[in-house]
Amino acid sequence: MYVSSRDGGAAMSLILGLTGGIATGKSTVSNLFKENGIPVVDADVGAREVVKAGTEGLKRIEVVFGHQVISSGQLDRKALGKIVFENPKELEKLNRILGDLIAEWIHDEKERYIEEKHPLVVLDIPLLFESGYQEVVDRVMVVATTPDVQLHRLMERDQIDEQTARQKIAAQEPIMDKMLKADFVIDNNGTKENTRIQVMNWLKKQQFLH
């Protein structure tokens, strides 16, 4: 159990922010935590949950972007995508709507796991530093590869050319910068087994596994 100085030395949950760069293998590490019974709050899941049929998020999107982005009561992602990716101002509007709702969803999920007294709660957030989430976690773990490995894995995963892959990588904060801000770094340049060993060793060292 994590002992925190912010609560008079009382035992409480450690909130670990998990992030990385595009195609560096964050999902692999996230799944390893889940396989070991560690609760993971996944921001990508939250992004889908907050715009489900009947949600406040879907209503807000309809008010701002119109009926054309709704199909049979569901979000028409293709129609919305066409609007926001052709107009940066529209994308900014969408990010403002979703950002607040996703933050609220993450907070509620995190608090639920804390109330259940889990010693470790992982917040899996792709743009953790870019969105300022380092302020709400106790520690940050970055899953990293070299830029060359990242580039080739992204090209292979998304079946895209090198120029497109470089543009996607350039849209995020460089992985090397994230590593400098991390409390823990998982080196994902090697095999999945090598990554698994690093995660298991970390869990044991932090006394979350015995």
What are these regions (language model features)?
Residues M1-A11:
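Short, Lys/Arg-enriched N-terminal segments with co-localized hydrophobic residues
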Residues G25, D44, L94, V122, ...:
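Residue-level signal for inorganic ion chemistry
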Residues P39, V45, R139, D183-F184:
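Well-ordered beta-strand positions
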Residues V45-P119:
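ATP-dependent small-molecule kinase phosphotransfer cores
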Residues I106, E135-V136, E156, I160-K205:
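Small-molecule kinase domains that catalyze NTP-dependent phosphoryl transfer to phosphate-bearing small molecules
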